[in-house]
């Protein structure tokens, strides 16, 4: 937890960690605005209930979706309201816009909010300004902020370049994020350098759908060995043949992993173990 966070913000951060004070398993269900209806979208409420019952720490949703979800599920997991949006049909899908506010999210019962920034995109300046404004509102209301940071734009050749990912994490930290979601760079040692340098927890993205379950679990294990605090994995959970079973396997790996000692380890130590 942030050492200088006010009581209310610290309390909300602790509530996010339902099963472990150091690790997080988040399932974003915010893809539908960007890509269209989710798989099983007509069953959003039971899907959220299934995830909440299988050791997921937090679920990311857009504000309108909450009208169609039983609040009971969020006595078992945390609600993260996503404030950013764009669609794949836009002239620039990387241009994210704010579609909600911290205050509105609080009225809906949010435990935290999230914003999306595409570092290097043509709309970067607006997204950074939006995140700064959201961070100020989070300070005013003592609400945890999850920053989803992606190197993504016309000058970005390799979005997993460790220097770019480190820069994205630093932008989030400097603007006031409590948690950062970003890309796994593909190397345990390189990821360990990024996570060790970050004063806030870093969770890695789940990425595109992969039908190979063992490959998904190996990816998460590598990220944890690289010091990640956990994952924010959507499609590889909610598009799995059995989302609850997949959530259980990921939760067990994240919360009961033998790599726990490597989490947020000094970069040199992690590199030696890689």
Curated annotation (Swiss-Prot):
It is an enzyme of class 4 (lyase). Keywords: Amino-acid biosynthesis, Aromatic amino acid biosynthesis, Lyase. Its EC number is 4.1.2.56. InterPro entries: Aldolase_TIM (IPR013785), DeoC/FbaB/LacD_aldolase (IPR002915), DeoC/FbaB_aldolase (IPR050456), FbaB-like (IPR041720). GO terms for molecular function: fructose-bisphosphate aldolase activity. Transmembrane segments: none annotated. Optimum temperature is 40 degrees Celsius. Optimum pH is 6.5-10.0. It catalyses: 2-amino-4,5-dihydroxy-6-oxo-7-(phosphooxy)heptanoate = L-aspartate 4-semialdehyde + dihydroxyacetone phosphate. SMART domains: DeoC (SM01133). GO terms for biological process: amino acid biosynthetic process; aromatic amino acid family biosynthetic process. NCBIfam families: PRK07226.1. Homodecamer. Belongs to the DeoC/FbaB aldolase family. GriI subfamily. 2-amino-4,5-dihydroxy-6-one-heptanoic acid-7-phosphate can be converted to 5-acetyl-1H-pyrrole-2-carboxylic acid (5,2-APC) by a non-enzymatic reaction. Catalyzes aldol condensation between L-aspartate-4-semialdehyde (ASA) and dihydroxyacetone phosphate (DHAP), to form 2-amino-4,5-dihydroxy-6-oxo-7-(phosphonooxy)heptanoate. This is 2-amino-4,5-dihydroxy-6-oxo-7-(phosphonooxy)heptanoate synthase. It comes from Streptomyces griseus.
């Amino acid at each position: 937890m942030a050492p200088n966070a006010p009581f209310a913000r610290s309390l909300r951060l602790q509530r996010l960690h339902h099963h472990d004070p150091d690790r997080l398993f988040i399932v974003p269900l915010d893809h539908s605005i960007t890509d269209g209806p989710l798989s099983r979208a007509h069953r959003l409420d039971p899907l959220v209930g299934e995830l909440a019952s299988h050791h997921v720490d937090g679920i990311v949703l857009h504000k309108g979706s909450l009208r169609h979800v039983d609040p009971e599920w969020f006595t078992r997991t945390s609600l993260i309201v996503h404030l950013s949006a764009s669609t794949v049909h836009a002239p620039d899908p990387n241009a994210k816009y704010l579609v909600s506010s911290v205050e509105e999210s609080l009225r809906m019962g949010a435990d935290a909010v999230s914003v999306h920034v595409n570092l290097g995109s043509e709309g970067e300046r607006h997204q950074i300004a939006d995140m700064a404004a959201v961070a100020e509102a989070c300070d005013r209301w003592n609400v945890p902020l999850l920053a989803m940071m992606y190197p993504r734009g016309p000058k970005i050749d390799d979005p997993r370049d460790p220097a770019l990912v480190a820069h994205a994490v630093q932008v989030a930290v400097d603007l006031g994020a409590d948690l950062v979601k970003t890309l796994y760079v593909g190397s345990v040692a390189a990821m360990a350098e990024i996570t060790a340098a970050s004063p806030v927890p870093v969770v890695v993205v789940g990425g595109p759908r992969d039908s190979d379950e063992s490959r998904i679990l190996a990816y998460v294990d590598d990220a944890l060995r690289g010091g990640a605090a956990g994952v924010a994995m959507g499609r590889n959970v909610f598009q799995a043949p059995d989302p609850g079973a997949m959530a259980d396997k990921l939760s067990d790996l994240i919360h009961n992993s033998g790599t726990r000692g490597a989490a947020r380890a000094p970069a040199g130590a992690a590199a030696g173990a890689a």
